[in-house]
């Protein structure tokens, strides 16, 4: 297994070097470099993140490995190549800007590719293998840790270019998920390094849904001393466009004024209901359902107290009832296990 993992990593390093060389060698690669620079991403950041280019054509990387005595890297496990119906091998990444994805320690474990023409899917990631699991990795985390000796917070943005734009403006604490929703693994990894995680979303309906999903995933692992915040951008804006319009200082003000979890949670629930007794009861039920996944903590107790004030209902008794139900359930499960053992 160790040998397979080393082969995958070595293959990725060789591919990364090839893709990086095409930015300067390939005529279209030079145009791609200009395209990236025009989006406000600095040459220094392009170099630090080792951005590359996969040229047009079906076998550029395949031919490079073949002609460079690197045939051992042409295998199914790595995920750099695909096979046609006629069993012919061709490049998986073609005519795309290439973003090497690195582990926390800096090993290249996969790639993200952004299409230039809109005929193909916009983003393409390496398939998962022994060293690359999308639900566990975060783009930019290696660079964030490398650039910050005393890291206090991390902002999670939506895409690779958002991370690069923020780094280019010296906001070097940005990461992105790999084209998937935030997972429990992502959050646990971030909270192992920082006490404050800020999610940055578009202000549209999709962004609101993504924020709610992230919150629900976070609730079971939030604990005293850890903070979750939400930053919603104006419609039709992303970090790159806002940085261009407002500059670093104003964007960091937005980060500082992000909504804390308690405010976001209360607003999410209460905005669905009016002030009638029936709806206050319904809001309380939804709120208790949401926080039921949270571990016991001072923070959870304070959330309950503050929400109780907002709906003018004492929820402490409800908490005791829920807690008692859980104890009974655990007790019954233990009794059932005992009966099975007999």
Tell me the role of every PLM-derived stretch.
Residues 13-24, 58, 151, 287-295:
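Extended, non-catalytic structural segments that build the interaction scaffolds
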Residues 11-47:
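Non-catalytic interaction/clamp surfaces of large macromolecular machines
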Residues 103-104, 145-153, 183-197, 203-342:
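A charged alpha-helical hairpin associated with nucleic-acid processing machineries
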Residues 10, 14, 31-35, 60, ...:
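Amphipathic alpha-helical interaction segments
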Residues 14-15, 57-193, 210-211:
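Phosphate-handling DNA/RNA-contact segment within nucleic-acid enzymes
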Residues 3-8:
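Short, small-residue-biased leader/transition segments that mark boundaries at the very start
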Residues 39-54, 170-180:
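Short, well-structured beta-strand/strand-turn elements
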Residues 40-51, 69-77, 83-86, 310-321:
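Short, surface-exposed acidic
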């Amino acid at each position: 297994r160790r040998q397979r993992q080393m082969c995958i990593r070595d293959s990725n390093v060789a591919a990364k070097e090839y893709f990086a060389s095409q930015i300067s060698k390939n005529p279209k690669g030079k145009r791609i470099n200009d395209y990236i620079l025009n989006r406000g991403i600095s040459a220094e950041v392009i170099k630090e993140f080792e951005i590359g280019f996969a040229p047009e054509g079906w076998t550029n990387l395949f031919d490079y490995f073949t002609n460079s005595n690197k045939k051992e890297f042409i295998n199914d496990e790595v995920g750099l190549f695909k096979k046609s119906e006629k069993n012919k091998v061709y490049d998986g990444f073609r005519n795309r800007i290439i973003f090497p994805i690195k582990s926390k320690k800096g090993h290249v474990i996969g790639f993200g590719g952004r299409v230039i023409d809109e005929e193909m899917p916009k983003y393409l990631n390496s398939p998962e293998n022994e060293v690359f699991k999308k639900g566990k990795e975060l783009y930019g985390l290696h660079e964030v840790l490398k650039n910050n000796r005393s890291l206090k917070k991390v902002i999670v943005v939506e895409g690779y270019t958002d991370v690069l734009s923020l780094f280019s403006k010296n906001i070097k604490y940005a990461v992105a998920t790999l084209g998937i929703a935030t997972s429990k693994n992502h959050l646990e990894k971030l909270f192992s390094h920082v006490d404050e995680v800020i999610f940055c979303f578009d202000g549209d309906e999709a962004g609101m849904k993504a924020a709610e999903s992230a919150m629900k995933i976070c609730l079971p692992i939030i604990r005293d001393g850890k903070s979750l915040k939400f930053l919603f951008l104006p419609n039709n804006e992303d970090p790159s466009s806002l940085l261009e319009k407002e500059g670093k200082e104003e964007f960091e003000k937005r980060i500082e004024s992000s909504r804390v979890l308690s405010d976001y949670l209360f607003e999410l629930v209460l905005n669905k209901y009016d002030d009638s007794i029936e709806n206050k009861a319904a809001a309380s039920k939804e709120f208790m359902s949401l926080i039921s996944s949270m571990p016991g903590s001072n923070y959870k107790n304070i959330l309950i107290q503050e929400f109780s004030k907002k709906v003018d209902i004492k929820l402490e008794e409800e908490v005791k009832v829920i807690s008692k139900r859980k104890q009974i359930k655990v007790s019954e499960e233990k009794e059932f296990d005992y009966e099975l053992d007999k």
